[in-house]
A protein has these predicted regions:
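Phosphate-group recognition and catalysis centered on beta-loop-alpha active-site segments
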Residues: 1-296
Length: 296
């Protein structure tokens, strides 16, 4: 077998060949280091399911799976009778045109309520119903469950969600977050093996300092908080960043190139296209399948 050492070129110009190889090596290393560190393969996360249905309903969530989402982000709060239901708002005025609060209605009443968005009509699901539907359809897509705390009921909400998840053997398909840091920390204390993040709304100053050392598994931030310095700091602290709500494909690519690990979007089909395109053209090192990561 012919090797470099006995080639004619090397014998005649050893210094030139050595210098050329060194230059190529430096270029390759530079290209590698230029790529931002990404803590796991980038995920497409459908915001409240997707735009293709009434938010947080069966239609929007099942369509998110069909459109290529890795996860559907859903909002979960408690009904009057303590059942986790999937709805974002504290009242029904926007989606059902009713002057009723979620906390004052039973799960049965809520599940019978029609909600509307554009040409779509659907009903409010319970978390239990939704998980059963996903499992029945053998849906690979998981759920990013946001705990919507009302009147300091974070611990009760977390306990109820734990019950539903474990009853349905859905531990490996779900990840969790909340705007309420106390609830995040409580859920961490109860199920430290679960993938639990903090959703930040408003000033990013709230997340500096000791938060990086509190075992947060990921951060979900608004678009305007996804700066180069912030994402780099998060990645250095081994905290993946998911950015919301990004609906423009070119912006999705920009955030992925910045080093974010998840795109939360109303259009999971656009997200799927952007992530697949990004993965074809980039060679990041992925810290994948670390402790606590769900199967995906």
């Amino acid at each position: 077998k012919r090797t470099l050492n006995n080639s004619r070129l090397y014998n005649h110009h050893p210094r030139m060949v050595t210098a050329l190889l060194a230059f190529i090596s430096v270029c390759l290393v530079g290209m590698y280091l230029e790529q931002p560190l990404m803590l796991h393969h980038p995920w497409v996360i459908g915001h409240r399911g997707s735009i293709y249905g009434v938010e947080n309903t069966d239609g929007a969530i099942m369509t998110a799976a069909d459109k290529g989402a890795d996860y559907a982000e859903i909002d979960v709060q408690l009904s009057k009778d303590g059942v986790p239901v999937v709805i974002h708002d504290a009242d029904l005025s926007r989606l059902a045109h009713k002057d009723e609060k979620v906390k004052n209605m039973t799960a049965k009443q809520l599940s019978e309520t029609l909600v509307y968005h554009n040409e779509y009509t659907d009903k409010i699901p319970t978390l239990d119903h939704l998980i059963k539907k996903l499992k029945k359809n053998s849906t690979k897509m998981g759920l990013l469950i946001e705990l919507k705390v009302e009147g300091g009921n974070g611990e009760k909400l977390a306990k109820k969600i734990i019950d539903v998840i474990e009853k349905n053997d859905y531990q490996k398909q779900a990840i969790y977050m909340s705007l309420d840091l106390d609830t995040v920390q409580y859920l961490q204390s109860q199920r430290p093996e679960w993938w639990i993040g903090y959703c930040i709304y408003g000033s990013a100053g709230d997340i500096e300092g000791s938060l990086w050392n509190q075992g947060i598994d990921f951060l979900a931030i608004e678009e305007n908080r996804a700066t180069v310095s912030f994402v780099e700091k998060a990645n250095r602290n081994w905290v993946p960043v998911y950015v919301w709500t990004v609906d423009d494909e070119s912006r999705m690519i920009q955030y992925l190139e910045l080093g974010v690990s998840g795109i939360i979007t109303n259009y999971p089909n656009r997200g799927r296209k952007a992530v697949d395109k990004f993965k074809e053209n980039n060679y990041q090192y992925y810290y994948h399948h670390g402790s606590g990561y769900p199967d995906s």
